[in-house]
């Protein structure tokens, strides 16, 4: 082979090699961006921290509320004008249950459905009843009346459960109706009935006239704002609350259709 031929072949081979595609045979792992991993870890740590704080918070609230002696509620029965619910006409009890806690006999101190319904009523301007159950209100009025805070609501829940375990529903309702403010320095349903209408809620008391369906609805509708609602000069808002209460009493079978119609005619609006 001629030397010139060799150079020619080498040139052709080099040119061929330069035109061939080259592939990277080394494995290069592609990882996730480090920022994503870091943000995920931060998020998980935040969730775990929040859960731990909530557990600690509710644990502390439970400990504090466990110190409340629910035996003390029995002292309400020592009031001179205390009347137990079993000695009242059924419609008197019904007036308060319908207005304040219509699921009273179905829950165990806290009512998720009732709270949700109350929230909806507030949003839609149909404020018919509060979000707290009657049991919670018993606890608030007796133990935490002067306390206004979110933690009070949590303590209420725990103490309300204790109250429900120790007392019957009728006892709890008696505590409620005999330890709330009706206005004009009246704190029992018997005292309020005597003061405003000259009647009694005690069906065994033959010395006074018995409270009527309408009068029961008026008192039950008053406790939401006792200093605002005036029995002797009823505002339109107060009248509408009484009407709503009477309707609910009928729906829940605390009064008959004829009792409802009679009360509505006596209301006269």
From Swiss-Prot:
UniProt pathway: Cell wall biogenesis; peptidoglycan biosynthesis
GO CC terms in record: outer membrane-bounded periplasmic space; plasma membrane
Reactions this protein catalyses: [GlcNAc-(1->4)-Mur2Ac(oyl-L-Ala-gamma-D-Glu-L-Lys-D-Ala-D-Ala)](n)-di-trans,octa-cis-undecaprenyl diphosphate + beta-D-GlcNAc-(1->4)-Mur2Ac(oyl-L-Ala-gamma-D-Glu-L-Lys-D-Ala-D-Ala)-di-trans,octa-cis-undecaprenyl diphosphate = [GlcNAc-(1->4)-Mur2Ac(oyl-L-Ala-gamma-D-Glu-L-Lys-D-Ala-D-Ala)](n+1)-di-trans,octa-cis-undecaprenyl diphosphate + di-trans,octa-cis-undecaprenyl diphosphate + H(+)
SUPFAM superfamilies: Lysozyme-like
InterPro entries noted in UniProt: Glyco_trans_51 (IPR001264), Glycosyltr_51/Transpeptidase (IPR050396), Lysozyme-like_dom_sf (IPR023346), Monofunct_glyco_trans (IPR022978), PBP_transglycosylase (IPR036950)
Pfam entry (one): Transgly
Annotated localization: Cell membrane
The keyword Cell wall biogenesis/degradation is annotated on this UniProt entry: yes
Topology versus the membrane: Single-pass membrane protein
UniProt EC number: 2.4.99.28
PANTHER family: BINDING PROTEIN TRANSPEPTIDASE, PUTATIVE-RELATED, PENICILLIN-BINDING PROTEIN 2A
Family: Belongs to the glycosyltransferase 51 family.
Name of the protein this chain belongs to: Monofunctional glycosyltransferase
Organism (species): Staphylococcus epidermidis (strain ATCC 35984 / DSM 28319 / BCRC 17069 / CCUG 31568 / BM 3577 / RP62A)
Gene: mgt
């Amino acid at each position: 082979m001629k030397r010139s031929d060799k150079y020619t072949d080498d040139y052709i081979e080099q040119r061929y090699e330069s035109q061939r595609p080259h592939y990277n045979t080394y494995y290069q792992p592609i990882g996730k961006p480090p920022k994503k991993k870091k943000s995920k870890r931060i998020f998980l740590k935040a969730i775990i921290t929040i859960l731990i704080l909530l557990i600690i918070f509710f644990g502390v609230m439970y400990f504090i509320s466990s110190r409340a002696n629910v035996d003390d509620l029995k002292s309400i029965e020592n009031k001179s004008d205390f009347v137990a619910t079993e000695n009242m006409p059924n419609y008197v009890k019904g007036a308060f249950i319908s207005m304040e806690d219509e699921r009273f006999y179905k829950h165990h101190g806290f009512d998720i459905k009732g709270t949700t319904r109350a929230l909806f009523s507030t949003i839609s301007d149909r404020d018919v009843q509060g979000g707290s159950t009657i049991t919670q209100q018993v606890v608030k009025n007796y133990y935490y009346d002067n306390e206004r805070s979110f933690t009070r609501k949590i303590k209420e829940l725990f103490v309300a459960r204790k109250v429900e375990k120790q007392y019957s529903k009728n006892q709890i309702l008696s505590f409620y109706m005999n330890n709330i403010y009706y206005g004009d320095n009246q704190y029992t349903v018997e005292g309020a009935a005597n003061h405003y209408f000259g009647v009694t809620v005690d069906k065994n008391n033959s010395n006074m006239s018995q409270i009527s369906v309408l009068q029961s609805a008026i008192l039950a509708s008053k406790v939401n704002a006792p200093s605002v609602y005036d029995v002797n000069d009823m505002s339109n808002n107060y009248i509408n609350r009484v009407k709503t209460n009477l309707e609910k009493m009928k729906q829940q079978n605390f009064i008959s259709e004829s009792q409802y119609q009679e009360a509505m005619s006596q209301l006269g609006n």
